[in-house]
Amino acid sequence: MTPATLAALHARCFQTPRPWSEAEFETLLADPLVFLLVEGDAGLLLGRAVAGEAELLTIAVAPEARQRGLGRRLVSRFLYQARLRGSDRAFLEVAEDNLAARTLYARAGFSPAGRRRGYYRNSAGDAVDALVLRRMLVDAADHGST
C-alpha cells in the first residue's frame, strides 16, 4: 500500500479522531523504527518499536470487513513483530468511547495503564479521554509468525 492508499483507507475508517493524511503516512513510513502491517486492502496497522517498547500507532479496518477477525490478526502480528524488534512491552492509546477497539485490545491482553483527559474530540466536539493500555510481551513464537 502506498501512503495515498493508506490515507484513503484511514479516511474510510475514521471521522473522529481525524483520519491521517498521505503526508503523515509518508513521514511515518520513512522512519526505520516504524513498521506497517496490512490485511489485503481492508486493514492496516502501523507500529513503532524503540528502546524495548512497542507502540501501536494506528489500526484501521474497512467498515465492510469488520467482524471478520482482521483486527485480531493485525494486533497479533503487531505483537509478534514488536517482539522480533526487541520489545518486551507494548502500549497504545484508545478513545474511551471506542468500545469495539477496547474489546479487541482487552482480548489481546492489554490492560489499563493510564488516562489522558480530553485527548480526543468526538463528532460533537466534546472532549473524550484517551485510555493508555499496555501489556508485557512474551516470546515471539507465542504470537504466530504472520
Predicted stretch roles:
Residues E93, S111-D129:
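Conserved catalytic-core motifs of GNAT/GCN5-like acyltransferases
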Residues Y105, F110, L133:
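Conserved active-site tyrosine of GNAT-family acetyltransferases
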Residues A95, A124, D129-M136, T146:
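Conserved catalytic core of the tyrosine transesterase superfamily
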Residues P3-R68, R72-R85, R135-T146:
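Acetyl-CoA-dependent GNAT
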Residues G71, V75, D97-A101, G118-A124:
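Short glycine/proline-centered loop/turn elements that form peptide/ligand docking sites
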Residues T58-A60, A65, G69, G86, ...:
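Conserved functional loop/turn residues at catalytic and ligand-binding sites
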Residues A82-E93, L104:
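Conserved GNAT acetyl-CoA-binding A-motif
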